[in-house]
Amino acid sequence: MWCVPSSCNYTEIQEALEIALDPLKVEGRVDLVVSVTQQSCRTLASDSTVFDLADWIYISILAIFALIIIASTSYDIAKQGHLRTLNRKDTKHVLLTSFSFYTNGKNLLRTDRHRDAIGCLDGLRYLSICWIIYGHTHYGEAMGVKMNLAEIPHMHHDWSTMLVLNGNICTDTFFLLSGILLAYTEMARRYKESNWRFDAIGLYVHRYLRLTPAYAMMIGFYATLFYKFGSGPHWNTWVGANRDYCRENWWTNLFYVNNYVNLPSMCMSQSWYLATDMQLVWLSPILLYPMLKFTRGFFFWLVFALALFFSVLLPFLITFFLGLSGTMLYYKEPTMVAEVYKKIYTRVYCRFGPYIIGLALGYVLYKTRSCVVKIHKLYVIGGWLIAAAAGLAVVFGPRAMYFEDHVYNRIEASFYAGFHRQLFVLAISWIIFCSVHGYGGPVGKFLSWRGWIPLSRLTYSAYLCHYVFLLSDSGLVRTTGMLTPMGIVRSYFGNLCLTMFLSAIWSLSFEMPFMTIDRTLISRRKQQSGLTTQPSQGKLFGSTDSGKDMYRSTEETSSTISQTYNDDIQGKSCDDSVYNSAGDISYHCEIHESENPQDIDSCRKTDEEQRRYNHIYVISSAEHPKDASGWSTPQVPKPCGHIDITLHENLDENLNKESRNQSEKENYSLDNTNTYLIREDSNEICPTDKGYNGTVINS
């Protein structure tokens, strides 16, 4: 960086530099091209702040939001003394407090977790965004003004730098989580609503309303005020260019087509992921419909297998016929990096593999959501070893491609391009599955740490905000520096802390309020349409209320406790579910005709706290009474294709209240025939008949 008189223009500076550096070119020691652009020249006049119409419009929008937030927070605080008489679920009250920093702040900092939540998703979500921010920070430092840039082509000699050079694989974790949560929430809705129908349009509208407000406000910030926050020789190159891109192409972002339309001038370069994820939601009914419609699952698994096959085939063929590298080899072949980015990296037809694996895993997790899955210890160890080997091979495998003596192999590149993303997310899927079913060990405990919960709630806003600080760092530089590991770590933690601070403000202002509004309006629409819903199935993402990978959505709950399974009577299994009074599934399992009914106990939750019931439920299904010695038949009664679960609120009237005790068993007679009696705090299901005394423990 040099200081010259302000009367000099950029062409004169370029001519002077060419004359000064010409001896180096003549002697052949340096082959260089001198280029000075008008944007790289800064003066006091050019740095003066000027606001145009777009700036004032955005400022006005911010002012309106600020007034709404102040009013909502004031109302919320004023009503705190009247909470006993105020219905917190009242639609009017919920909408009036949706922008309250008080309520939203409390919700953001909560660390309680629903008992059926998959806690490991909190850690996975936050650590993934940390990995992304680290990779982008390293990239920004390497692209900056450094004195030792000649060392960059040798980065791959250090194994640890592959976490940066191949760190783009981390985005597939979010595609996986998105598929998991979409499948799980739609499966829960399928069995929660008595007159369920697949509503693709509702899914699209919900997703759009869920993501767009915070996204649109960040696009507006890029296009207007961001440029006013600094200056420097590279400010126009980084921040100014993004301002221009966002003013020209904002509509491609809001329509979520920016990964196809005007890709080289994309507003917010990280936003390709949001477009790709939205497009995957648009395509998801291809798998979601057979998953939800055909309860036996055969057709779904057939469609899944075909989709998975094409997810490997398409990037394989594109890489093979275009002669591309297997991944983006950043500093080895810059032109090849651009081609891979345009033809494969940002294209939905090359990125849907992890997403459909997520859909399948979400389906499996829902089906086994309350079962005790027993896996032999050797299989568990083997699974962890294979998952670790696959994950490490995917991340560190391309290192050999960076060396100069590596000869390009079309088959090698095509195989890596086709398989590496699927292998990586399968390894992550194993971690999730094991953590859910008690085989996660220290990894599962670490990922399920409650400290991740508030941080994971900020993941989406952090993804939107983190580039603000990266672009600022690159644009403000006025002196050269050294590219060192410690310098990168220092920059990373600075960027991470600032990102989390800004993302908290962004989430409280533009994300959480619209999430509350969306949830409230959907719940009200369902009530008006007369939908009868089942009790909440337990939130897979309960701790973070996250419904979509790095995005959050909270499912509506209902006080209606009833459920009917209408499976094929000729089928070989049926689903039994037991609910507590809060409407949460206590356990769920498939009972096969050839199994002993006592094996139902093997499918229960092992945690005693998760088996406490406040009411007694009767499942109309049994056909054979039980004698004093045990079951009259070793088989489950065949007519288990139709099971009604009904809450008997007046069951206490049938009990002898004088002999009631919290810890003692009681006997009473039921007039119902062909029923199972579920006993509280016992894990037994007793078939009853007229005159048979069922046994109950009251809690």
Which residue ranges define each predicted feature?
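Alpha-helical transmembrane segments of multi-pass integral membrane proteins
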Residues: R347-L361, I381-M512, L531-S536, S543
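Kinked, hydrophobic transmembrane alpha-helices enriched for aromatic residues
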Residues: D116-H154, T161-A183, R210-F229, F255-N258, ...
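Generic alpha-helical transmembrane segments of integral inner-membrane proteins
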Residues: L67-I70, S74, C130, A216, ...
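Hydrophobic alpha-helical transmembrane segments of integral membrane proteins
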Residues: D122, L165, T171-D172, L176, ...
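Intrinsically disordered, low-complexity regions enriched in proline, serine, glycine
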Residues: T11-Q14, A142-M143, Y184-E186, A214-G220, ...
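Exoplasmic/lumenal regions adjacent to the first transmembrane segment
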Residues: M1-G123, S128, G135-T171, F175, ...
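Helix-loop boundary elements of multi-pass alpha-helical membrane proteins
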Residues: A71-Y126, Y184-P213, L280-L308, A360-A389, ...
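Aromatic-enriched alpha-helical transmembrane segments of multi-pass intramembrane proteins
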Residues: E248-A275, W282-V425, G487, C497
